UniProtKB/Swiss-Prot annotation:
It holds the Pfam family Ank_2. Transmembrane segments: none annotated. This is Ankyrin repeat and SOCS box protein 8. The modification Phosphoserine is found at residue 17. Signal peptide: none annotated. It is found in: Cytoplasm. The lineage of its organism: Eukaryota, Metazoa, Chordata, Craniata, Vertebrata. Pathway: Protein modification; protein ubiquitination. Gene3D superfamilies: Ankyrin repeat-containing domain, SOCS box. The SOCS box domain mediates the interaction with the Elongin BC complex, an adapter module in different E3 ubiquitin-protein ligase complexes. The gene is Asb8.
Length: 288
């Protein structure tokens, strides 16, 4: 082997070793206790190198280290790069930490990036009920009605967990409450599936009431028969039967129609400018 080839191979090996140490340092795996991120980058660690399924930027978001996220971006980390799971750093940040989300968005992260299952960062923020991340993403142009592989929206993801805070914010931004996924499920039927498992709390009950106000009228029955899992809870079944049997009133149907006509914008601001009495504005905003 020529000396020049040996030198090139040694250089590549050294850089790879530094990059692996960078990942370990960010993740606080102290194989090298005296390592720090800035020194490793200065020494030649590649901020875009993938180790296994991980990239440094994604790893920093996983441990909610906003300072490290900003440092990596300053040093050239690709903000929309995909890791081994076809996820961007923003997918990880959206689940965990608003500060990381804000830094990534400032550096040009795509709020509508899709992972391997067509999930957006907003889907994950809503599912984890990270309300401030939900708000930050929506303010930065995230699609409130983005569809995953099953045609579920972020509202569906929030509803299936009974995440009241996230559901409320999504509805404020005009989320479509009557969306139906490929299995025929709606956000409210997703929430009912949680309630029938006996896992409902006061917050989940409040989430149901909010979704019910937003949708106006809904139907869970098929050919007049409630799903078998619903019938196992007699009290809940009776309540849902009454609600499903009640036709939507002109008032509730008008509320849904007006909210939808206002389009995809922050509805509290849009409603505020309407020439309506305060009581009607509150009604449109699902406050009563």
């Amino acid at each position: 082997m020529s000396s020049s080839m040996w030198y090139i191979m040694q250089s590549i090996q050294s850089k790879y070793s530094l990059s692996e140490r960078l990942i370990r340092t960010i993740a606080a795996i102290r194989s090298f206790p005296h390592d720090n991120v800035e020194d490793l980058i200065r020494g030649g660690a590649d901020v875009n190198c993938t180790h296994g399924t991980l990239k440094p930027l994604h790893c920093a978001c996983m441990v909610s280290d906003a300072d490290c996220v900003e440092l990596l971006l300053e040093k050239g980390a690709e903000v929309n790069a995909l890791d081994g799971y076809n996820r961007t750093a923003l997918h990880y940040a959206a689940e965990r930490d608003e500060a990381c989300v804000e830094v990534l968005l400032e550096y040009g992260a795509n709020p509508n990036a899709l992972d391997g299952n067509r999930d957006t960062p907003l889907h994950w923020a809503a599912f984890k009920n990270n309300a401030e991340c939900v708000r930050a993403l929506l303010e930065s142009g995230a699609s409130v009605n983005a569809l995953d592989y099953n045609n579920d929206t972020p509202l569906s993801w929030a509803a299936m967990k009974g995440n009241l805070e996230s559901v409320s914010i999504l509805l404020d931004y005009g989320a479509e409450v009557r969306v139906i996924n490929l299995k025929g499920q709606t956000p409210i039927s997703r929430l009912v599936a949680l309630l029938v498992r006996g896992l409902g709390t006061e917050k989940e009950d409040s989430c149901f009431e909010l979704l019910h106000r937003a949708v106006g009228q809904f139907e869970l029955r098929k050919n007049g028969i409630m799903p078998r899992e619903v019938t196992k809870d007699q009290q809940l079944c009776e309540k849902l039967t009454v609600l499903c049997s009640a036709p939507g009133t002109l008032k509730t149907l008008a509320r849904y129609a007006v909210r939808r006509s206002l389009g995809l914008q922050y509805l509290p601001d849009a409603v505020k400018g309407l020439p309506l009495p305060v009581s009607l504005k509150d009604y449109l905003l699902l406050l009563e």
